[in-house]
Amino acid sequence: MLEGIEREAAEHSNGCSGPAGHAPPAGAPRHDWTVQQAVALHDLPLFELIDRARAVHRAFHGEHEVQLCTLLSVKTGGCPEDCAYCPQSSHYETEVGPERMLDVGAVLAAAERAREGGSTRFCMGAAWREVKDGPAFERVLDMVRGVKALGLEACCTLGMLTDDQARRLKEAGLDAYNHNLDTSRKAYKSIISTRTYDERLVTLRNVRRAGITVCSGGIIGMGESIADRCEMLVELARLDPHPESVPINALVRSPGTPLESLPPVDPIEFVRMIAVARVMMPRAMVRLSAGRTELSRETQLLCMYAGANSIFYGDRLLTTPNPGQDEDRALIEKAGLQPMAPAAARAAR
C-alpha cells in the first residue's frame, strides 16, 4: 500500500513519474493532496525526496537566487493571545514586556537600512490578536505607504483582519500579509485557545479577496507528530491559489513559555519539511524563518537546495535572535548564491 501511495504522490507532485529529478514538473499545482500522500512523500529516502524537490524548484524558480526579507516588530509584547510558543504573550512571565508602538519615522528608517543591506521585502509585525480600527491602524497604513515609497515590497503580520481592513491595506500598497496556521488542526488545540483554526482561515480568505498575496506557514518542534506537520502543509496546499509565501519556522524555545523545555528540532526533519513544502506548493516562495540560529550552515544550505529560496535577514525576528547580516551574506557568497533582485522577486511571487 505504501508503494502505491508513494507512486501516486510522486506522479501528482508536479514531478514526473519515473526517476526523480530526470523530467521537469508540469501542469497546474495540485489542490487535492491528502495527509496520507503527504506523509508518504515526507517518508521517502531523504536523497530521493530532495531530488524531487530540487526538480520542482528548478522548473519554477531561479536555481541560485534567494530573496532577503527583513521583519520588524512595530508593536512588541502585551499580546492577549496564549500561543504557547510566544514570548510576547501576556499570559506568560518572559523577558519580553509590553512596549509602545513605534512611530512611522523609526519604522521607515529601519526599512531604509534593510534596503541598503539588500532586503527586497520589509515585513512589519504587531503583537495584536486582531486589527482594530483607529489611530494605531492608521499608523500602520502610513508605514505601508512609506515602505512602498522606498521601493520595497511591504508585508504585515497584525493578527486577524476584516474584509474592510484588508481592503484598506491593499489601497495603501500592501503586497503581502502573513498569517500562519502554525500547525495541524488537531495539534492546534494544545498550542492556542484564544483564536480558532477557522478564524485563521477566514483571515487568509479576507486577505486573498482584497488582492493581497498570502504568506502562511507554520512552526515545527512544538510536540506535534509527522502527520501533524504534513496535515498543516495539506491545509495550505488545498488553498486555491496556494499561498505565495510559505514560511517554515523551527520552534524557538523562549524562556517562560510553556514550550521552553522541548527538545530542538532535528535538522534532517527540518530539511524534509522544506522539501515537502516545495513539492506540494511549487510556485511558492518557501522561506527559512525563525530558528535558524540552531541550524548549522550546512543544514541551511541543504534546505536551500531542497527548495527554500528566501530567508529573513537581520539580527532579530520580532523578539527572537537571528543570524547577523554579515554571517548570512558570507553564507550566500560562499555558496555561490545571488540575492534576488526586486524585479525578480516580484516575478517569482
Curated annotation (Swiss-Prot):
Quaternary data: Homodimer.
PANTHER family hit by this protein: BIOTIN SYNTHASE, BIOTIN SYNTHASE, MITOCHONDRIAL
Metabolic or biological pathway: Cofactor biosynthesis; biotin biosynthesis; biotin from 7,8-diaminononanoate: step 2/2
Biased composition regions of type Basic and acidic residues, renumbered to the chain: 1-11
Biological process according to GO: biotin biosynthetic process
Its EC number(s): 2.8.1.6
Protein family: Belongs to the radical SAM superfamily. Biotin synthase family.
PROSITE patterns, sorted: RADICAL_SAM (PS51918)
Taxonomic superkingdom: Bacteria
Keyword Transferase in record: yes
EC supergroup of this enzyme: transferase
GO molecular function: 2 iron, 2 sulfur cluster binding; 4 iron, 4 sulfur cluster binding; biotin synthase activity; iron ion binding
Catalytic activity annotation: (4R,5S)-dethiobiotin + (sulfur carrier)-SH + 2 reduced [2Fe-2S]-[ferredoxin] + 2 S-adenosyl-L-methionine = (sulfur carrier)-H + biotin + 2 5'-deoxyadenosine + 2 L-methionine + 2 oxidized [2Fe-2S]-[ferredoxin]
Keywords recorded for this protein, A-Z: 2Fe-2S, 4Fe-4S, Biotin biosynthesis, Iron, Iron-sulfur, Metal-binding, S-adenosyl-L-methionine, Transferase
Limits of the Radical SAM core domain: 64-283
Entries under SMART domains matching the protein: BATS (SM00876), Elp3 (SM00729)
Protein source organism: Sorangium cellulosum (strain So ce56) (Polyangium cellulosum (strain So ce56))
Region listing for Disordered, in residue ranges: 1-30
Residues the entry annotates as binding [4Fe-4S] cluster: C79, C83, C86
Cofactor(s) recorded in Swiss-Prot or TrEMBL: [4Fe-4S] cluster; [2Fe-2S] cluster
Name of the protein in its database record: Biotin synthase
Main function: Catalyzes the conversion of dethiobiotin (DTB) to biotin by the insertion of a sulfur atom into dethiobiotin via a radical-based mechanism.
Binding site for [2Fe-2S] cluster: C123, C155, C215, R287
Note accompanying the cofactor annotation: Binds 1 [4Fe-4S] cluster. The cluster is coordinated with 3 cysteines and an exchangeable S-adenosyl-L-methionine.
Family matches, as InterPro entries: Aldolase_TIM, BATS_dom, Biotin_synth/BioAB, Biotin_synthase, Elp3/MiaA/NifB-like_rSAM, rSAM
